[in-house]
Structures are given as C-alpha cells and as structure tokens.
C-alpha cells in the first residue's frame, strides 16, 4: 500500500527519485501512464497486469471503455527503477502532467501519483473545502 506525500525533483534527464518507502514494491517493475486531473499514475507491474486483465475481459462494445483503454494503454511506459530508485518519465508524459522540476509524489493506496507541485497545491486547495463533506458520500458509515 502506498501512503504519504513526498517532494522529489525531476532532474535534467527527466528522472525522478522515488521515495525510499515506495521502492521495494516497485523494484520488480512498474508502469507509468496518464492519470486523471493531469497527474501520472505509477502502478507496480502486478497491479497494472490486474487492471489490464479487468479491461481485457470487459465488453469492447462500450465506447467509453474503448476510449479510456486507448488513452490509458497508448500512454503507458514500463520501467524498472535504477539502483538509486530513479525512474525516467518519458517526455510525452512529462508534458501531459506539466512536470518541469518541482514534483509531488503521493501514495494513493494501490498506485503512486506524480503531480506538478503547483498543480497539486491548486488541486488540494480546491478539495480541502469539500473534503469533510465527501467522506459521508464516498464512505458512508466507514469513517
């Protein structure tokens, strides 16, 4: 499970150092792809495979599924962190997420999200106002 928020920097070669606490789960391989709200999703290879299987068995007659799958898979890039825990984010994915230097890497349960620092701050400020109200809608009776 991925938890917490970290603030690594993207280097000039487009590499990002993963937080130490995330490395063990990602060291066997990972997949980076487009996420919602212009962030990137990073999945351990096993989790990406599970998602792929779910999408593979879904009916291709559903246009929304075809559209989502095309974007999700065509933007995906597999990688293995180097010995320093760095991954290379391909230029098209960096452009999509607006990643230049300052980044935020968030644990999001079964995935990691990579955000441009300013975009994350804006998103978080927008969500803070409704966060307290969301729990009852999203998790009724759980929290």
UniProtKB/Swiss-Prot annotation:
Its main location: cytoplasm. Forms oligomers. Residues 5-47, 76-119 form the SpoVT-AbrB domain. InterPro entries: MraZ (IPR003444), MraZ_C (IPR035644), MraZ_dom (IPR020603), MraZ_N (IPR035642), MraZ_sf (IPR038619), SpoVT-AbrB_dom (IPR007159), SpoVT-AbrB_sf (IPR037914). Keywords: Cytoplasm, DNA-binding, Repeat, Transcription, Transcription regulation. GO terms for biological process: negative regulation of DNA-templated transcription initiation. The keyword Transcription regulation applies. SUPFAM superfamilies: AbrB/MazE/MraZ-like. Belongs to the MraZ family. Transmembrane segments: none annotated. It comes from Parafrankia sp. (strain EAN1pec). This is Transcriptional regulator MraZ. It is found in: Cytoplasm, Nucleoid. PROSITE patterns: SPOVT_ABRB. GO terms for molecular function: DNA-binding transcription factor activity; transcription cis-regulatory region binding. One of its GO terms (cellular component) is cytoplasm.
